[in-house]
């Protein structure tokens, strides 16, 4: 019995040794098969994680790039707005300068014309005295002698002298008019305080009120400006 028990124990130990010896090999084989099976999944997972990380990286880079572009566009817009404002300011300055220059040109041309037109004003004032003397000389000759049918030799000489003075006066007034000097003869016109100077007023029932009925001294205008007002008598019926 003892031998049988020992034999059984020895067999059990051998069998256990064989099982123990075979177990590591099977475990290794299983682990290798499991590794082979898991390797594609690991590689796929690694690729997925790598792709995801790369995608996140690209997304971050894209966001940063977009943010950088946005900042650059904003900066360019500010520069453009500043340049537009500067351009408008310079345009406004140029327009104002051009307007001021045109006004200066017009004012200068007006001043030059005025200086030219009235450069002879003092000379004209002295000249109208000579014209007045012509008129006074002509007014001395009696009109009835000029119209007389029976004329003596002396009377004919007087008429010829009168006609000569009258012609000279007419030519002188025509020449003065060419240079802007005109005589004001307001008799029968409505009184104009800008051109006439009323020296006296009198009621005259047969004439309209405020009408010039007598001229004491004729006036003159130089290029439309009154050089000397006419001295007149005015009707006053009111």
Curated annotation (Swiss-Prot):
InterPro entries: GrpE, GrpE_coiled_coil, GrpE_head. PROSITE patterns: GRPE (PS01071). Belongs to the GrpE family. CDD domains: GrpE (cd00446). PANTHER family: GRPE PROTEIN (PTHR21237), GRPE PROTEIN HOMOLOG, MITOCHONDRIAL (PTHR21237:SF23). This is GrpE protein homolog, mitochondrial. It holds the Pfam family GrpE. It is found in: Mitochondrion matrix. GO terms for molecular function: adenyl-nucleotide exchange factor activity; protein homodimerization activity; protein-folding chaperone binding; unfolded protein binding. One of its GO terms (cellular component) is PAM complex, Tim23 associated import motor. The keyword Coiled coil does not apply. Essential component of the PAM complex, a complex required for the translocation of transit peptide-containing proteins from the inner membrane into the mitochondrial matrix in an ATP-dependent manner. Seems to control the nucleotide-dependent binding of mtHSP70 (hsp70-5) to substrate proteins. Component of the PAM complex, at least composed of hsp70-5/ssc1, grpe/mge1, tim44, un-4/pam16, pam17 and tim14/pam18. GO terms for biological process: protein import into mitochondrial matrix; protein refolding. Its main location: mitochondrion.
């Amino acid at each position: 019995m003892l031998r049988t028990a020992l034999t059984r124990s020895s067999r059990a130990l051998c069998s256990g040794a064989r099982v123990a010896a075979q177990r590591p090999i099977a475990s290794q084989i299983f682990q290798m098969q499991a590794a082979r099976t898991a390797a594609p999944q690991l590689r796929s997972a690694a690729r997925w994680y790598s792709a995801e990380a790369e995608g996140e990286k690209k997304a971050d880079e894209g966001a940063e790039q977009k943010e950088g572009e946005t900042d650059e566009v904003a900066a360019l817009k500010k520069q453009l707005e500043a340049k537009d404002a500067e351009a408008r300011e310079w345009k406004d300055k140029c327009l104002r300068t051009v307007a001021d220059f045109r006004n200066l040109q017009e004012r200068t041309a007006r001043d030059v014309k005025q200086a030219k037109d009235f450069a002879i004003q003092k000379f004209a004032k002295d000249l109208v005295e000579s014209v007045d003397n012509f008129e006074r000389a002509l007014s001395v000759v009696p009109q009835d002698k000029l119209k007389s049918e029976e004329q003596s030799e002396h009377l004919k000489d007087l008429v010829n002298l009168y006609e000569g003075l009258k012609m000279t006066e007419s030519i002188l007034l025509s020449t003065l008019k060419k240079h802007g000097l005109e005589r004001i003869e307001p008799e029968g016109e409505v009184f104009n305080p800008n051109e006439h100077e009323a020296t006296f007023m009198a009621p005259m029932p047969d004439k309209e009120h405020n009408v010039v009925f007598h001229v004491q001294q004729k006036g003159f205008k130089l290029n439309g400006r009154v050089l000397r007002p006419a001295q007149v008598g005015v009707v006053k019926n009111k």
